[in-house]
Swiss-Prot record:
Cholesterol binds at residues 75, 77. Induction: Up-regulated in ovarian surface epithelial (OSE) cells with progesterone. It is found in: Rough endoplasmic reticulum membrane; Nucleus membrane. This is Sigma intracellular receptor 2. The gene is TMEM97. It comes from Homo sapiens. The record marks 56 as: Likely important for receptor folding. Its main location: endoplasmic reticulum. It is a multi-pass membrane protein. Residues 31-68, 121-140 are lumenal.
Length: 176
């Protein structure tokens, strides 16, 4: 597979990632920060099922720091998702480079405390977490695996934007 074909495969992966992120953000993540009345009972039940089944303490009783990440997702990331979907599914949109770098770094930065919480928090002593919590290493790793794509795909995006010869920044020079 040549460089243009590889680039198109990565662009399609990224386009589908952003496309899939729209309903996940709207119907799951933002329930923690938007009024409950906005969501049909089916979506509320889906979130309850997920949070209980996977013992996700952040979505059962979201702490303030996690809600701040969700607010950023609402204000900054959600408007970017359709733009990024368009740019990557269309392909060859060099203008997406800078916004994609900003998105990827922001998202990876928010995932560090989330994944660290799942891996290292002593939930038996943590009074800020109510409801079911991961108790075993297997339950913690299961939660990490649910959130890991939101660290890995932005990392791929960042490397792609920084290393792809197609997306590399070229300084425009004035002709004399």
């Amino acid at each position: 597979m040549g460089a243009p074909a590889t680039r198109r495969c990565v662009e399609w992966l990224l386009g589908l990632y952003f496309l899939s992120h729209i309903p996940i953000t709207l119907f799951m993540d933002l329930q923690a920060v938007l009024p409950r009345e906005l969501y049909p009972v089916e979506f509320r039940n889906l979130l309850k099922w997920y949070a209980k089944e996977f013992k996700d303490p952040l979505l059962q009783e979201p702490p303030a720091w996690f809600k701040s990440f969700l607010f950023c997702e609402l204000v900054f990331q959600l408007p970017f998702f359709p733009i990024a979907t368009y740019a990557f599914l269309k392909g060859s949109c060099k203008w997406i480079r800078t916004p994609a770098i900003i998105y990827s770094v922001h998202t990876m930065t928010t995932l560090i405390p989330i994944l660290s919480t799942f891996l290292f928090e002593d939930f038996s002593k943590a009074s800020g977490f109510k409801g079911q919590r991961p108790e075993t290493l297997h339950e913690r790793l299961t939660l990490v695996s649910v959130y890991a794509p939101y660290l890995l795909i932005p990392f791929i995006l960042l490397i792609f934007m920084l290393r792809s010869p197609y997306y590399k920044y070229e300084e425009k020079r004035k002709k004399k």
